[in-house]
Amino acid sequence: ISMDKHATKAALKDTDVHLIPDRLIAHGEFPASKWYPCVLKDPLGGSSIGVWICHTPQDLKTAYTQSDTKEFLLERYILGEEITVAVFSNQTYPVVSIRPKEGFFDLEAKYTKGKTEYFVPSPLSPQICSNAQEQALEAYQKLSMSGIARADFIVTEQGEVFFLEINASPGMTATSLSPMAAQAVGISFPELVEQILHTAKCTRSQHEESYKPPNGFWLLT
């Protein structure tokens, strides 16, 4: 379910996860928005590919005509700081603040060295961080997820925490966000990989009953 942003939000509708208003648009149905700015995106997309921030109806028309996805997800645009929370085996890890030097956290900002600054633990207030961690854990549990997942959020200037998506297969390079968060609680990249491999070959019950990480932390991504 988590691979589909619209299906994920539908599954989380009756939870305490703070969702951004949206609507699903079929290909061939010209979109009209009651929110400006708004965001047009591929509900099955990743790495911010095919994400358009539209400030006017003309922007929305341009985004629509230049996209070739089967469906579109139209959302109200939320201005704020992006953060991410890793969850592993029902445990949340420190919040990471993501601050692109220009624009938003798009494909270039994600994968070009020096384009984005990361802060872990996040300098945001403990209340905001706790809120994000609680929402991430609730989404993880509601979707019956296991192993590693990473939930992304937007935090407004007023301190509201809005859920963006939860990634069941987050990046796992030495410079990815999950290892970055793990390092903040003393888990090295090799240790993180070892824990992932261990849990991958265990059933949930075996994993929870027979294995405890030596430093007391389950990894996060």
Whereabouts are the PLM-identified features?
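Alpha-helix boundary/capping residues
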Residues: 15, 66-68, 111-114, 139, ...
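ATP-dependent carboxylate activation and anion-phosphoryl transfer catalytic cores
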Residues: 126-221
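A general structural signal for well-ordered alpha-helical segments in protein cores
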Residues: 5-9, 60, 104, 175-178, ...
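Active-site nucleotide/adenylate-binding loops and adjacent lid/helix of ATP-dependent enzymes
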Residues: 1-80, 221
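Phosphate-binding site of ATP-dependent enzymes
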Residues: 55-134, 155-162
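Short small-residue beta-strand/loop micro-motif enriched in glycine and branched aliphatics
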Residues: 48, 117-119, 173-178
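Broad gene-expression machinery/nucleic-acid interaction feature
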Residues: 35-37, 82-84, 150, 163
